[in-house]
Amino acid sequence: MLYWLTQLLQGQYHAFRVFQYLTFRSILASLTALIVGLLCGPLMIRWLRGLQIGQMVRSDGPQTHLSKAGTPTMGGVLILLAITVSCLLWCDLRQTSLWLVLLVTLANGLVGWVDDYRKLVLKNSKGLPGRWKYFWQSVIALVAVSYLYWNASLPVHTQLTAPFFKTVTWDLGIFFPVLAYFVIVGSSNAVNLTDGLDGLAIMPIVMVAGALGVFAYASSNAVYSNYLGIPYVPNTGELTIFCSSIVGAGLGFLWYNSYPAQVFMGDVGSLALGAALGIVAVVVRQELVLLIMGGLFVIETLSVILQVGYFKYSGGKRLFRMAPLHHHFELKGWSEPKVIVRFWIITVVFVLCGLATLKLR
């Protein structure tokens, strides 16, 4: 909205031409989302407390988590509000890719909201049954991928580029939608599994989103993409602003989600933000780079898969003390803040490795 207004004023006031630049609007978008999060956070927390929407704690989990019972959750609504407001203000709303990414994010947030609502308000301990959650995630992903694949306004490259190798590519052809589907749904669920400690998931989300914003910026520019050896994907520059909005909204949420947390994001936040990372990576054709930068999410997911598989194969034995992996380290005696910060450090390394693929080819 404000971007459209500045476009009208450019003819009379040359100073407004600065709003043409993605970098400038990205900064404003991030600051806007941050301010919305910081200002609305206390109101959201009080509102959730008034509704008695508090976190339920696993009885078989670390004993230190018992004190978290009753902490307001569904705070992901605040994150999505900040992202949406920021994008509506500073993005060029004529870009189809922006609406695709934003709608996928909000749709997955709706699935998470229903799950949280059933668990916390209706007191249904199972929430939204897993098969239905996966069904609706799949529907959203398939609709998005189909639109991306067949819509002429979003030219899709079916080539999968290998990170660190300039000339190694695989043309997926009709299998592109399959890969894209698994990236979106897998990313959504991986972030959901990681969101188990105060601030553990949101900071890696912020870091990965910021890095994806760099890729979106480079991919939307023919000169930069050719120089860096990455796919050129036109009409995707506004995704830089979308990613910047995630950064700002995430930092605003972290203000209240840092240890000891005043609010949790819930499935409404984790499913939405995970899907956001996935769909952005698909649109800018950086699926394998997302696998690198989101290495923490991958490790957490693999720990659950290995734990379940080993438990069934061994007849009841466990590979880890508890899954996901962050609980394993808690039960080994690590304090919660130590687990969180060390996992953040791991994410910094993964994100730097992902960014290194821009130049090391």
From Swiss-Prot:
UniProt pathway: Cell wall biogenesis; peptidoglycan biosynthesis
A single Gene Ontology CC term: plasma membrane
EC assignment: 2.7.8.13
Transmembrane spans: 27-47, 70-90, 97-117, 134-154, 167-187, 199-219, 236-256, 263-283, 288-308, 338-358
Any GO BP annotation: cell division
Xref: CDD domains: GT_MraY (cd06852)
InterPro entries (UniProt xref): Glycosyl_transferase_4 (IPR000715), PNAcMuramoyl-5peptid_Trfase (IPR003524), PNAcMuramoyl-5peptid_Trfase_CS (IPR018480)
Molecular function terms, GO-annotated: metal ion binding; phospho-N-acetylmuramoyl-pentapeptide-transferase activity; UDP-N-acetylmuramoyl-L-alanyl-D-glutamyl-meso-2,6-diaminopimelyl-D-alanyl-D-alanine:undecaprenyl-phosphate transferase activity
Compartmental location: Cell inner membrane
Keyword entries, A-Z: Cell cycle, Cell division, Cell inner membrane, Cell membrane, Cell shape, Cell wall biogenesis/degradation, Magnesium, Membrane, Metal-binding, Peptidoglycan synthesis, Transferase, Transmembrane, Transmembrane helix
Family: Belongs to the glycosyltransferase 4 family. MraY subfamily.
Protein name from the UniProt record: Phospho-N-acetylmuramoyl-pentapeptide-transferase
Record organism: Legionella pneumophila (strain Lens)
Lineage: Bacteria, Pseudomonadati, Pseudomonadota, Gammaproteobacteria, Legionellales
